[in-house]
Each structure stands twice: as structure tokens, then as C-alpha cells.
């Protein structure tokens, strides 16, 4: 059964947006499967996928967003981490995981299965135990929810990632608000997640001036003297700020085709940073 583990984990992670929770869900599915009478199970793989998806949907349905400092953001994953068991090509971008939070769990699952794994409506209906018409309706609602977002069809642009990261880090270190503004689109949004343990200065800022001012304030008051690494999480570039081997803050960036920053996802929640190891591409 372990041969299915990575695929099951990828399904679960895309639905729940938390690597730790996804691991627990898959482990629970596998442990329960061991005790089942398998005489009527014809396709082990399909059975485990179906069980995992429905378990993840039920978990997401029960899960109430905890009171957090700032905005709730997904747990990022690095594919270069030896402990990460996700299938890279099938794992959603960080931006997409953020967008999927606007959908209910079944809409989220239907969207992921159709758009991420190219399932037919017949296959989705079987997995979710609904009709094909219900599957179409779920996907239609999901698309309507996401279509107003300019990032619904977002795909990462890696060509200019390191150049932008370098300029971004230098501007922060020098408290250069003008240069920061030059790196941001006009309607830039910054979202910060401190979880239940770390209070953030601001959960959300929109616009060049407000965002650049906040970034410099945080740099000068909380990140001075920290070392940094440039890394990738969920297919997107990021800068991580460290004190020795302890990670304090991670900025995941969304870049447009011109290398400008459209979104900044700032994570300071220690529970979401604990699986990140110190890697550097520079």
C-alpha cells in the first residue's frame, strides 16, 4: 500500500491545504484499510483514492478556521525537502491553494479532480458518490467563484524569479521604499498569517505604498540581522528569513510575466514553517 502513499498524499494536500493534516488523513485511511475485508474490493488503488478524497472532504467540512493572527494561509511545501512525499507535477501552486479556500470542500475536490488530475465527470461522480449532473454543477459553481480572480489561470513564471528575489531582498535590507514600489504591481496585496501563536503587524495590505511601507517596517523591527535563503514552495519563489537554523518568516511571491510582484504571502506561523529546511539556490 505504501506504493500509493505519494499519490494519496497529493490528493489530500490539494484538498485540505495542510501537509501535516494530509499526512494524518492518509495514514488514517491506510490503517483502516488494513483491517477491512477486501474480498469485494476489485480495484485497490481506486478504493484508496476514493477513501482519501472523501476523508479529506469530511475533514475540510468539519474544520472551522481557527482564530488566527492575520489571514489563514495554506501550509507551503518544498519539493526539494527529502521528507516531502508529494508528486510535484500534481501539486497545486501556492496561489491556487489560496484561491481554493473560497470554495466549499466538494467544489474544491471537484475542481481539483477535473482541472488538476483531468478526471471525467463520470469518474468524479463515482469518487464523490454523486451524479454526473451534480459533478458538472459543482465544477460550474467552482469556476464561477474563481473566474473573477485575475489569478484563476495563474501559472508561475520562473525566468525572472531570482532577479526579482535579489532586488526584493536588497530593497528590504536597505529600507528602499521606492525600489520596493518599483517591484510591485499597483494593486499588490500582502497577506500575513501568524497562526494562533504570533501576532502580525497587519493581516492584509493592498497597494504599492501601504505594502512597501509595511514591508520596511517589519524588516527594521523584526528581521534585522536575520540571514536569508531564496527557495521555491509550491512552484513559486520565496525568501526565507532565519536566525541560525530557526525560520522566522517566509515570503512566498507571485510574479507576473514581467517579473513584478502581484501577491506576497507572508507566513510567520511556526506550525506552518516547521517542515521547511534551509536550502539555497544562490
Region annotations inferred by a language model:
Residues 1-10, 20-23, 39-40:
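A short, charge-rich alpha-helical start-of-domain segment used by transcription regulators
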Residues 8, 12, 22-33, 48-51, ...:
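Short, small-hydrophobic-rich alpha-helical interface motif
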Residues 27-44, 63-64, 149-153:
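Sigma70-family region 2
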Residues 50-70:
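Arg/Lys-rich amphipathic alpha helix in sigma70-family domain 2
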Residues 79-107, 161-162, 166, 170:
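Amphipathic alpha-helical segment used for protein-protein interaction
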Residues 105, 117-134:
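Helix-turn-helix DNA-binding module
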Residues 110-111:
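A short pre-motif secondary-structure segment
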Residues 126, 132-212, 216:
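Solvent-exposed, charged amphipathic helical/linker segments at domain boundaries
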Amino acid at each position: 500500500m505504501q506504493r500509493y502513499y505519494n499519490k494519496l498524499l497529493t490528493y489530500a494536500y490539494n484538498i485540505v491545504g495542510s501537509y501535516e493534516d494530509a499526512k494524518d488523513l492518509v495514514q488514517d485511511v491506510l490503517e483502516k484499510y488494513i483491517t477491512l475485508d477486501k474480498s469485494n474490493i476489485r480495484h485497490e488503488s481506486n478504493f484508496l483514492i476514493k477513501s482519501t478524497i472523501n476523508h479529506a472532504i469530511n475533514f475540510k467540512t468539519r474544520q472551522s478556521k481557527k482564530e488566527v493572527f492575520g489571514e489563514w494561509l495554506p501550509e507551503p511545501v518544498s519539493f526539494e525537502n527529502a521528507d516531502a512525499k508529494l508528486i510535484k507535477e500534481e501539486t497545486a501552486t501556492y496561489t491556487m491553494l489560496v484561491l481554493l479556500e473560497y470554495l466549499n470542500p466538494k467544489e474544491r475536490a471537484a475542481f481539483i479532480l477535473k482541472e488538476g488530475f483531468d478526471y471525467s465527470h463520470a469518474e468524479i461522480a463515482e469518487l464523490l458518490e454523486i451524479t454526473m449532473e451534480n459533478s458538472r454543477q459543482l465544477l460550474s459553481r467552482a469556476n464561477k467563484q474563481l473566474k473573477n480572480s485575475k489569478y484563476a489561470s495563474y501559472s508561475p513564471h520562473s525566468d525572472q524569479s531570482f532577479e526579482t528575489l535579489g532586488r526584493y531582498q536588497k530593497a528590504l535590507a536597505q529600507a528602499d521604499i521606492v525600489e520596493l514600489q518599483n517591484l510591485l504591481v499597483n494593486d499588490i496585496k500582502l497577506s500575513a498569517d501568524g497562526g494562533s501563536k504570533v501576532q502580525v503587524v497587519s493581516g492584509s495590505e493592498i497597494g504599492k505604498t501601504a505594502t512597501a511601507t509595511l514591508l520596511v517596517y517589519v524588516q527594521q523591527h523584526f528581521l534585522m540581522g536575520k540571514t536569508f535563503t531564496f527557495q521555491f514552495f509550491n512552484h513559486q519563489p520565496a525568501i526565507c528569513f532565519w536566525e541560525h537554523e530557526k525560520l522566522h518568516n517566509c515570503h512566498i511571491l507571485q510574479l507576473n510575466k514581467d517579473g513584478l510582484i502581484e501577491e506576497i504571502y507572508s507566513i510567520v506561523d511556526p506550525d506552518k514553517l516547521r517542515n521547511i529546511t534551509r536550502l539555497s539556490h544562490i
